[in-house]
């Protein structure tokens, strides 16, 4: 029997039920439940359906005039009645995703301490480093299967937000549920409070985190190690997603733990997977291969390099050598294009630096090759922005790219909207509507000469919920590169533009449940093939995915002995 249809036996009654967001039904408690659980008189007389509740909640939602207030309102529903919250969000997913996650969640993180209302998740401070096991045991969620953890140091494009970064794990897990069907009872947001280097927070009397500079070095490594070991003791089968760690920690933590635990870094691997999936869809629409493209990145941090490495892997899978694939990828950061003779390149940047001997025929060859120089010399067909710096895809650069590429692929992916390298409207106007555009944050459709262009949001929410569902359904013990590549290919197969020759580059968010299930199946199949999960048939795997897919419906309650 579907878990949603089984009665749930509860050992408590009265107001305590109304204070438990995973259990509370509000006005939807039946007459029998109100009697058995001592709720008579605590609720208005009328018994409502969840759709009636959602209709009222949506009317209230529309009365708020700004996005931050809407975010706070939705979070209040989440903290009082999670089933209603997810029914409401799922009914209006396209409208509400930018409110519960990017870009609005960035403002919520900045105001986290000022707007704090109710506890959610776990805050593990360095001061309590010797009591992490006890803290995990204090969690209100007992059967945790997915954890999203941050240390708040690199929140979107906003930098160090300290414990305010908790808004990101909360938002991400909301998408695991609303997009990927993961029961909210299985999710846990965690913030590692290691201090902050943000002077505004240190001086803010309302800041609720540790008011001390961030720890680093061996102290930091030992603290994260203690956390990972404690989680493995408490929930050995849980999937751990690293979120918004600073560049200096993100890649080292991923490299350290990816072969020890079931974990991944969404900023590096999730962003890479959705970008590769979007590129594969764009290439299909243009009737070409990814291995035929010349790709330029603006931004050579851990996220940009993670995307680049995933692109190289996909190119190699299409039949070209790794050396040739790397020659077709050009990384530009604040110091110019990465070159092999540059000092102080980070380990993950070194493999993506262009060999100086290959650049001697370039115009303006120097130690500092600008983005425009790269566009004019390398003649890229794909331009990807992960710089976090607004306006750097200028009209001159886009037009220079378009002059040698009839249908350029341009992905300004930086979040939030205020950090985007160029707006879709500008890119499409500068290319007379020829560019294939996807962005990291949501944008309205663009109209040029009576033609409407839907702007695909190259958002990780297309990928990570499906990965989580696939891991849960298969029981996978690791998240491998091949599993991530499978998620990219599955996403590309869902592209309306690639399939039908028209429409958006990525599926509509209204279809996200179907997309997540398709990705989950692809991810789980590879997990089984690689030995990360036990063998099963396609039919049983499909059943497991459906069985693990939670829907926002109320269960009936029965009272058990105290």
Swiss-Prot record:
A divalent metal cation binds at residues 243-244, 267. Disulfide bonds: none annotated. Its EC number is 1.1.1.38. InterPro entries: Aminoacid_DH-like_N_sf, Malic_enzyme_CS, Malic_N_dom, Malic_N_dom_sf, Malic_NAD-bd, Malic_OxRdtase, NAD(P)-bd_dom_sf, NAD_malic_enz_proteobac. Divalent metal cations. Prefers magnesium or manganese. The record marks 267 as: Important for activity. One of its GO terms (cellular component) is cytosol. Pfam families: malic, Malic_M. GO terms for molecular function: malate dehydrogenase (decarboxylating) (NAD+) activity; metal ion binding; NAD binding; oxaloacetate decarboxylase activity. It is an enzyme of class 1 (oxidoreductase). One of its GO terms (biological process) is malate metabolic process. Its cofactor is Mg(2+); Mn(2+). Keywords: Metal-binding, NAD, Oxidoreductase. It catalyses: (S)-malate + NAD(+) = pyruvate + CO2 + NADH; oxaloacetate + H(+) = pyruvate + CO2. NAD(+) binds at residues 154, 267, 415. Gene3D superfamilies: Malic enzyme, N-terminal domain, NAD(P)-binding Rossmann-like Domain. The active site is at residues 101, 172. SMART domains: malic, Malic_M. Belongs to the malic enzymes family. Homotetramer. This is NAD-dependent malic enzyme.
């Amino acid at each position: 029997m579907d878990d949603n249809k089984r009665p749930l036996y509860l050992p408590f009654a009265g107001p305590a039920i109304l204070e438990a967001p995973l259990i509370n039904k509000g006005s939807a408690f039946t007459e029998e439940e109100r009697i058995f659980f001592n709720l008579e008189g605590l609720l208005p007389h009328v018994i409502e359906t969840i759709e009636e509740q959602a209709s009222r909640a949506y009317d209230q939602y529309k009365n708020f005039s700004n996005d931050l207030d809407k975010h706070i309102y939705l979070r209040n529903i989440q903290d009082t009645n999670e089933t209603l919250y997810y029914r409401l969000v799922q009914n209006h997913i396209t409208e509400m995703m930018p409110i519960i996650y990017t870009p609005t969640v960035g403002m919520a993180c900045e105001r986290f301490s000022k707007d704090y209302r109710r506890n959610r998740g776990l805050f593990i401070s360095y001061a309590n480093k010797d009591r992490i096991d006890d803290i995990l045991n204090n969690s209100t969620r007992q059967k945790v299967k997915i954890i999203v953890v941050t240390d708040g140091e690199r929140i979107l494009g906003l930098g160090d937000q300290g414990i305010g970064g908790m808004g990101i794990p909360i938002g991400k897990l909301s998408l695991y549920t609303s997009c990927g069907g993961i029961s909210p009872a299985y999710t846990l947001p965690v913030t590692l409070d290691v201090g902050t280097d943000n002077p505004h927070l240190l001086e803010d009397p309302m800041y609720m985190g540790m008011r001390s500079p961030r720890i680093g070095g061996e102290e930091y490594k030992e603290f994260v190690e203690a956390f990972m070991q404690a989680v493995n003791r408490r929930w050995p089968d849980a999937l751990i997603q690293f979120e918004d760690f600073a560049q200096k920690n993100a890649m080292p933590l991923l490299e350290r733990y990816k072969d020890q635990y079931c974990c991944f870094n969404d900023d590096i691997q999730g962003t890479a997977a959705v970008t590769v999936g979007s590129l594969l869809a764009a290439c299909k629409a243009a009737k070409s291969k990814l291995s035929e493209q010349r790709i330029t990145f603006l931004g050579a941090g851990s996220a940009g390099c993670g995307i680049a490495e995933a692109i190289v892997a996909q190119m190699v899978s299409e039949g070209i050598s790794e050396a040739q694939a790397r020659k077709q990828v050009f990384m530009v950061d604040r110091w110019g294009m990465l070159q092999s003779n540059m000092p102080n390149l980070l380990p993950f940047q070194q493999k993506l630096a262009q060999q100086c001997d290959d650049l001697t025929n370039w115009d303006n060859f120097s130690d500092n090759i600008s983005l425009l120089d790269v566009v004019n010399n390398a003649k890229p067909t794909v331009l990807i922005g992960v710089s976090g710096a607004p306006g750097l895809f200028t009209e001159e650069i886009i037009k220079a790219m378009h002059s040698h590429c009839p249908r350029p692929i341009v992905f300004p992916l930086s979040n939030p909207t205020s950090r985007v390298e160029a707006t879709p409207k500008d890119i499409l106007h500068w290319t007379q509507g020829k560019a294939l555009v996807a962005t990291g944050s949501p944008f309205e459709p663009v109209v040029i000469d009576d033609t409407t262009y839907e702007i695909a949001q190259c958002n990780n929410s297309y990928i990570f919920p499906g990965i989580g569902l696939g891991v849960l359904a298969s029981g996978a013990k690791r998240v491998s590169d091949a599993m991530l590549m499978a998620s990219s290919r599955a996403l590309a197969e869902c592209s309306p533009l690639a399939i039908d020759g028209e429409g958006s580059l990525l599926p509509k968010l209204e279809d996200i449940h179907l997309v997540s299930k398709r990705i989950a199946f692809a991810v789980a199949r590879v997990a089984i093939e690689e030995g990360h999960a036990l063998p099963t048939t396609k039919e049983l795997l499909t059943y497991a995915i459906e069985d693990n897919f939670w829907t926002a419906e109320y269960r009936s309650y029965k009272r058990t002995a105290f």
